[in-house]
């Protein structure tokens, strides 16, 4: 068995001041000799209080696809040209429980990759997964006002150039771009129907090469909420201390159409952001009209669409204890992640926000024996992707 080496670091987890890195180490061998484990490295954090969980960065958000190869190529065209592969396609019962698959002995993936965007100006990771067992193929949210994690925003230096390029490639848009230069946006859908909001930077950067997009980063994730004050209070517990309120506003017919509606849109909300680490931002919108009360995707976390937001903390068990004391609900207990062996030094767990959004905490964990499989389950079998030919 080869000596483990760090084969990749998740690049661009934050702005230029980010000192955190999420590292994945592996042994590049065949079959049972292949191991992979995830560890989260953050700087020594001076916790500001006994209730500070040390949230430092957005690790990634997860997209579950029905056709990995097609969706992977789509995001490659947007700039996600690098990635980390080699994750186990099966895992422990504890990992299945962490995803809400309580009655399943082991889940099974078809394919998976953490997509990376070299040169991005902030955290842009996407955990792209195609499930084999179990998989919920129901379509993702039909409109961008659905409760839950509804869309990701991509910042571009030249929206009109990107719009023309992507439209020529057959990408589906809700409308033509709306707004003035430096303040334009347009919604598009990926091959699975997931919404992406393309937003123009205030500092324009005219396209130098017409055959590639001018996407430069991911300014925020859009989360729709039923009560913005309650949601802001919830996210403050995680460390989103910087809050910029968005006053109630009714959009013009033209701007409402850019959101995909033929009636006036009214909403209020807040941008919440970390004041350290990668300083990433979430946009919480409370829709007043039109309002869709249908809940976010229920567990298990296997529905086609955007399913979870992964966040890094120094110590996952400490974070869970702090949040549970504040009545934050969790889907399951912490699971060692992700090799399926007793060498894992990281763990994951999913908190649940007031509207059902899954927030995956990823952090250091003291190595421990692999939790036993339930008595009715066959022996644990960790399988890995077939080596590339």
Question: Model segments located where?
Answer:
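Bacterial N-terminal signal peptides that target proteins for export
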Residues: 2-16
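Vicinal oxygen chelate
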Residues: 56-67, 113-132, 137-165, 184-189, ...
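N-terminal beta-strand motif that seeds the catalytic metal site of vicinal oxygen chelate
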Residues: 32-72, 84, 148-154, 200-232, ...
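Core segments of cupin and vicinal oxygen chelate
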Residues: 64-123, 161, 168, 178-179, ...
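Bacterial N-terminal signal peptides
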Residues: 14-25
């Amino acid at each position: 068995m080869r000596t483990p080496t760090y084969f990749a670091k998740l690049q661009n987890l934050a702005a230029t001041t980010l000192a955190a890195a999420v590292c994945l180490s592996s042994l590049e061998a065949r079959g049972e000799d292949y191991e992979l484990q995830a560890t989260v490295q953050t700087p020594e954090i001076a916790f500001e209080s006994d209730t500070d969980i040390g949230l430092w960065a957005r690790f990634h958000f997860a997209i579950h696809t029905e056709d990995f190869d097609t969706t992977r190529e789509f995001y490659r065209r947007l700039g996600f040209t690098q990635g980390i592969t080699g994750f186990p396609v099966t895992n422990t019962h504890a990992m299945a429980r962490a995803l809400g698959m309580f009655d399943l002995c082991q889940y099974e993936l078809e394919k998976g990759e953490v997509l990376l965007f070299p040169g991005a100006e902030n955290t842009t990771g996407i955990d792209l997964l195609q499930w084999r067992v179990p998989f919920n193929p129901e379509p993702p949210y039909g409109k961008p006002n659905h409760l839950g994690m509804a869309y990701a925003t991509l910042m571009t230096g030249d929206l009109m150039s990107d719009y023309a390029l992507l439209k020529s490639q057959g990408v589906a848009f809700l409308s033509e771009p709306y707004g003035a230069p430096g303040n334009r946006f347009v919604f598009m859908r990926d091959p699975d129907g997931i919404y992406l909001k393309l937003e123009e930077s205030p500092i324009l950067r005219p396209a130098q090469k017409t055959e590639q997009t001018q996407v430069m980063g991911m300014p925020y994730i859009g989360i729709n909420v039923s009560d913005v004050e309650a949601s802001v209070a919830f996210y403050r517990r995680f460390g989103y201390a910087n809050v910029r309120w968005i006053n109630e506003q009714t959009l013009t017919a033209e701007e409402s159409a850019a959101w995909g509606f033929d009636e006036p849109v009214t909403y209020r909300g807040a941008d919440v952001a970390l004041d350290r680490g990668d300083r990433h931002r979430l946009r919480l919108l409370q829709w007043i009209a039109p309002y869709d009360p249908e809940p976010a995707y229920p567990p298990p976390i296997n529905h086609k669409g955007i399913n979870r937001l992964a966040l890094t903390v120094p110590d996952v068990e400490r974070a869970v204890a702090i949040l549970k004391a504040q009545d934050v609900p969790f889907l399951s207990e912490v699971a060692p992640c992700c090799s399926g062996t007793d060498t894992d030094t990281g763990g994951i767990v999913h908190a649940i926000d007031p509207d059902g959004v899954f927030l995956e905490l990823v952090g250091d964990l003291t190595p421990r024996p692999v939790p036993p499989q339930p008595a009715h389950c066959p022996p644990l079998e960790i399988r890995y992707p077939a080596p590339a030919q």
